[in-house]
Amino acid sequence: MATTSNMFLYSLTIQPPTAVTQALLGQFSGTKEQQILTASGSRLTLLQPDPRQGKVNTLLSHDIFGIVRAIASFRLAGSHKDYIILATDSGRITIIEYLPKTNKFQRIHLETFGKSGVRRVIPGQYLAADPKGRACLISALEKNKLVYVLNRNSQAELTISSPLEAHKPGVLVLSLVALDVGYANPVFAALELDYTDADQDPTGQAREEVETQLVYYELDLGLNHVVRKWSDTVDRTSSLLFQVPGGNDGPSGVLVCGEENVTYRHSNQEAFRVPIPRRSGATEDPQRKRVIVSGVMHKLKGSAGAFFFLLQTDDGDLFKVTIDMIEDSDGNPTGEVKRLKIKYFDTIPVATSLCILKSGFLFAASEFGNHHFYQFEKLGDDDEELEFSSDDFPTDPTASYNPVYFHPRPLENLVLVESIDSMNPQVDCKVANLTGEDAPQIYSVCGNGARSTFRMLKHGLEVSEIVASELPGTPSAVWTTKLTKYDQYDAYIVLSFTNGTLVLSIGETVEEVSDSGFLTTAPTLAVQQMGEDGLIQVHPKGIRHIVQGRVNEWPAPQHRSIVAATANENQVVIALSSGEIVYFEMDSDGSLAEYDEKKEMSGTVTSLSVGQVPEGLKRSSFLAVGCDDCTVRILSLDPDSTLEMKSIQALTAAPSALSIMSMEDSFGGSTLYLHIGLHSGVYLRTVLDEVTGELTDTRQKFLGPKPTRLFQVSVQDQPCVLALSSRPWLGYTDPLTKGFMMTPLSYTELEYGWNFSSEQCLEGMVGIHANYLRIFSIEKLGDNMIQKSIPLTYTPKHLVKHPEQPYFYTIESDNNTLPPELRAKLLEQQSNGDATVLPPEDFGYPRAKGRWASCISIIDPISEEPRVLQRIDLDNNEAAVSAAIVPFASQEGESFLVVGTGKDMVLDPRQFTEGYIHVYRFHEDGRDLEFIHKTRVEEPPLALIPFQGRLLAGVGKTLRIYDLGLKQLLRKAQADVTPTLIVSLQSQGNRIIVGDLQQGITYVVYKAEGNRLIPFADDTLNRWTTCTTMVDYESVAGGDKFGNIYIVRCPERVSQETDEPGSEIHLMHARNYLHGTPNRLSLQVHFYTQDLPTSICKTSLVVGGQDVLLWSGLQGTVGVFIPFVSREDVDFFQNLENHMRAEDPPLAGRDHLIYRGYYTPVKGVIDGDLCERFSLLPNDKKQMIAGELDRSVREIERKISDIRTRSAF
């Protein structure tokens, strides 16, 4: 198979995966502050909790281009810094450290031990580090374990030994932890299951007798050897281990968690066992047993032996587990265990990892939905919850006991302080512009159970509005100003109207100021605080300089007026209507001195800008002048060459605004930029050489149809540019990548803006629109995707949009869940008064084996309060599996909602009683649904689409066409077209694209004259299809269950033959090839994304941008594939990608090319995520790559930036 292609795409991630597989706590920066490290897909993210504000901020996000299997942290004795161990699919163990100065991860060690990939005998699935940082054990799922000794050399550098083997064939590992043994030889505990006898016994008897064993592995540091120190049989259902503190802090050992029990075990201690309490309630199954799925141990400061565990069940209930120790005569714990105790603590969503911070917070990385950051109110010591002790229960796991129960309740010990957006699992996604804005929005359904959500994603920065005040007139401009150079906050808001100026004071209340010294009878062009305590007001007829109540006026020359002005703390420049530039500078005595000569421009001046005075200097060296002849000129302001022209740049339209600013760049310093706004709505950013005044490296972006105005503002202590067109934008340096970003604000249109600072709002902005004054602030610069969510009832399965109205329809279903009618019956039957109904979004729905809860929801996403308009519950134990909106030609083109369901479904192995197709009629423009009828089919129909005024349904492996009848759907045509199961359908004209569960894509043609469905081409690979979309008439893009996205194309000759009239007989009798169709599809594009694609569509994301392929992934990823237009760009980015592979190899040692071609060699796709790491390289590597590519560094960065901004976010 050729790996070259005539189609090339550029892959970019818009939203990285948000499903956290593991999170751990550590002092990674070497200070006392704790950070949280999370692994999400191929990304490592370092989070910084802020206890004062109760927020979690992202410090660093790094794509390692590999699958993170496990992470662990350790600290060498005497050190204050935690190191990170990575176990990935690279077949190597990696040790990295976080460098806070450069905000990067640095690899310290990379040791190869096995093959790459995720294999059951290659270590990496489990990882444990000794609490004293002396060794780590990395284990495979089966057979192989390796121990590495960690130490430091004479230069105090971290060293790692050769691996020590602890292999045993025929053994499966279920869980692994390191024991806390103080400074004795390191010991690791593993839950193991020996299947040797069961593997060789054909009767299955040995399988029933398999035992789960707790095994201790000891590393003898003296002999440098690993021995199997101790093993004992534990409860057969055991699946999870937790480390118990040792040394001076506790008895050491482990907690072994199995089905409905937690047992303390250690080699030199008795076993102690407590049951996991069951929920009591009218709708709860009293026989259902719970298992522990996650937990955390926390040591309390101040006293030895003070620690507790928080263990979480699969319901989300947290239980506090404590260990009582026998005390000596002085009342000190001896290290010998007396009893184990468990009590209900609180209920939170099920988490993959729990982290307790020293500052009294709990971070819960949720398995599904948003992650949560809680604060401890209390530790649950003095509440009235029942506590169960090991004294009352047998240690023998086979012995009978009476189950214990508890009543779940709302949070008492924890309080939620922040919820971190996560779209995992993301089930379906659509792109539409429902709000009438410039760019479309992404609408997605995600989540699980009662915590499922419908989400609206919009490109932009979140804005917090502080004040929106109506004004007596319509102002044209607004400024804020301090009174003196040393003031911390602004004192005045100055508003310019067509016939005057209004000055307002900033304080507890905003009041008009009458003695400010400003001229209030004329409009204002500029306001600036100058010198120590002076104020400048520029108005059309002159300049007013106000110093300590004294007013000095500079009048404009006769018959001329001022048309533009700019100023900083030492300089003022004005432009007269005659085209002359007049320059003023502040004298040492605080007065304004006019430069003798005036500079005459060739056209009318439309805008001016003088930059801020650099630190340590007296003046800004350059003045930018924009004229109506579509040029920008740079004039010098140096004393030796005042108002001399340094450079000129031609523009495509007249400039409407200019701003000279110094901003941080990706080179590790700052660069002087000239920002240009044009009358055409285009924004330009160009580099202004600080020595010569030359303009280079121009980048542009279309912001909207209105003229662009620019204002320098400050956000998070960094200079930014506020650009106002048909909507407001903010240009800033990305905190993580240091690349320049131009992002829209999620806010109303503004006509003018300025910085704003007061006691209540330290760093905000003031803006005007029509007759409203608005004060607002921007909290976060890192996240440029705004999410709004609407809660759903059950796990969503599919999302469809009304063809004409702004409404969405979701089908939702949950397995093993009590449906509403059964819940109501059980509550009615409850006689003892215990009929409390807890909110399902916090506690989940009651479970019931074999039962389905399912519904159809109508969603209005754009009303003032986005909400679910109607919900239709399905009964008869049916679960909705597919949906489509179909216009039936027999009903004069009226559209109906068609929903496919399955009855009594079992997912594994696949079973069902029968399937149905429900038909609903729309009322009130789609706001209401009326049930028409349902049609029985043999299997649940997993795919439905409209087709030529009828319904096309995939029922099992049969493709059917239905028309609408009075009492049920009428079958019109059918054919068996795939070998396994139809899961997706697309159509264009007479061509139908069928996606099979296991066998990839099949092209089918519908011949109306014979009413036949004929498959004529299929794929060369057996792909496990999840989603498909037609790119054009011949090409189809799809995703599979293993994380691949591909494009296949039908050969042109075959495509033409199938569409010819009279080709039906030829197609029906064509000879099948290798048990498939007569023809094969050719592979054009193939790329491994590492997230399971759940939807893919062809759409445009930006104004005037080209069509892209947007895909969504199960773990919350949103990505795009951008087609290249020119071969020159393809060659450039291919060369850049090759250089990046060599100069910036993946952190964990995975080969990038092999990673992106995990199952099939990568074809026709360039990895944009890798190319975008160019800006993070050291300057010497950037220069080296630029030299190899025969380009400048800025040119490479511009091309990387342009390809994203022109087609994506």
Curated annotation (Swiss-Prot):
UniProt keyword Transmembrane helix present: no
Family affiliation: Belongs to the RSE1 family.
Residue stretches in coiled coil: none
InterPro entries: Beta-prop_RSE1/DDB1/CPSF1_1st (IPR018846), Cleavage/polyA-sp_fac_asu_C (IPR004871), RSE1/DDB1/CFT1/CPSF1 (IPR050358), WD40/YVTN_repeat-like_dom_sf (IPR015943), WD40_repeat_dom_sf (IPR036322)
One of the record's GO cellular component terms: spliceosomal complex
Name of the protein: Pre-mRNA-splicing factor rse1
UniProt record, GO biological process: mRNA splicing, via spliceosome
Subunit structure: Associated with the spliceosome.
Localization per record: Nucleus
First-listed, main subcellular location of the protein, grouped into a coarse class: nucleus
GO molecular function, one term: U2 snRNA binding
Entry keyword set: mRNA processing, mRNA splicing, Nucleus, Spliceosome
SUPFAM superfamilies: WD40 repeat-like
Pfam families referenced in this protein's UniProt entry, alphabetically: Beta-prop_RSE1_1st, Beta-prop_RSE1_2nd, CPSF_A
Gene: msp-5
Protein role: Involved in pre-mRNA splicing and cell cycle control.
